A protein has these predicted regions:
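Beta-strand segments within the central parallel beta-sheet cores of soluble alpha/beta enzyme folds
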Residues: 9-10, 22-27, 48-51, 196-203
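A glycine-rich dinucleotide-binding beta-alpha-beta segment and adjacent secondary-structure elements
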Residues: 129-135, 191-251
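Generic, well-ordered alpha-helical scaffold segments in large soluble proteins
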Residues: 7, 11, 15, 54, ...
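Helical element adjacent to the flavin cofactor pocket in flavoenzyme catalytic cores
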Residues: 1-42
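Mid-domain catalytic core of redox enzymes
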Residues: 26-146
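Hydrophobic, well-ordered secondary-structure elements that form the walls
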Residues: 52, 92, 154, 186, ...
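Short glycine-/acidic-enriched loop or helix-start segments at secondary-structure transitions
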Residues: 62-64, 231, 254-255
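C-terminal segments that line or cap access tunnels to active or ligand-binding sites in enzymes
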Residues: 95-206
Length: 256
């Protein structure tokens, strides 16, 4: 997915676009119901008539535009939306090639049960780690890691709520206990994982919330109810010149 993002950015730059990295958009200024400018966190005001935001409608309208500048109908629609799933991710580095681990496919689903209802219930608890997806980047791109090594990520879907209830004093232990359980599940399919594991870094829904800036660390946008699909959710804001893109206004996060 990062390679896809890089390709899109490269094309944007090639056609004359200006991309600013490490430069947060802090505010969207609205005048007379229309987009007027974007203010960066450094205080620079950039005049514009259009903004396409992939930050999600909640941060965009509440944090950047400001509720006081939003039409009442827009806020009413926003209030009806439900924050969707986040994830627990274990990033791993190994001291061998994928073939030595028995990995010959880039993506593998590893599950302890075939019951989707059971799996969904577990996503709302801290004893999940029963359903996972492991992606080894080096299978599709042998040059992704240095020779003789490989990288993989192990992911299971989780809601943020149970993690928000963990006291700070217990967060570290809870996070690594969950990572251990997830790794044990993956070992059922690839028994030599732990033997060749050199580096491992877990990320909880709170980690994703911090770095994505999305409510609940959501990776797929809103909950997948029918009312949250593009059939009912408009990508165009009631504020003239403001548009939404990304998983919050599309399908399942499978789009740039």
């Amino acid at each position: 997915s990062q390679a896809m993002s890089n390709a899109i950015c490269d094309a944007f730059l090639r056609f004359g676009g200006d991309a600013r990295f490490n430069c947060a958009a802090g505010k969207i200024l609205v005048r007379n119901g229309k987009v007027a400018a974007v203010v960066t966190d450094d205080g620079e005001e950039i005049t514009t008539k259009f903004v396409v935001s992939n930050a999600g409608p909640i941060p965009t309208l509440i944090d950047m535009v400001g509720a006081e500048n939003c039409p009442a109908d827009e806020l009413k629609k926003l209030n009806a939306r439900t924050v969707g799933l986040s994830a627990f991710t274990l990033y791993m580095g190994f001291d061998c090639e994928p073939s030595e681990l028995g990995i010959d496919k880039a993506t593998n689903f590893i599950c302890a049960s075939a019951d989707p209802e059971y799996g969904h219930r577990k996503m709302k608890t801290l004893d999940g780690a029963e359903f996972s997806l492991m992606t080894c980047y080096d299978v599709d791109d042998p040059d992704f890691s240095p020779p003789g090594t490989c990288q993989a990520s192990l992911v299971t879907l989780q809601y943020a709520q149970p993690w928000m209830s963990v006291p700070p004093s217990k967060y570290y232990d809870t996070k690594y206990r969950f990572a251990e359980k997830l790794l044990t599940l993956a070992e059922k399919a690839f028994p030599d994982l732990r033997k060749h594991l050199e580096e491992a870094e877990p990320a909880t829904p709170l980690t994703h919330m911090r770095y994505l800036g999305h409510p609940g660390g959501s990776i797929y946008g809103s909950e997948h109810f029918t009312r949250e699909t593009s059939l009912f959710v408009d990508s165009k804001s009631a504020i003239e010149g403001l548009y939404f893109t990304g998983a919050w206004n599309g399908s399942g996060g499978f789009q740039p």
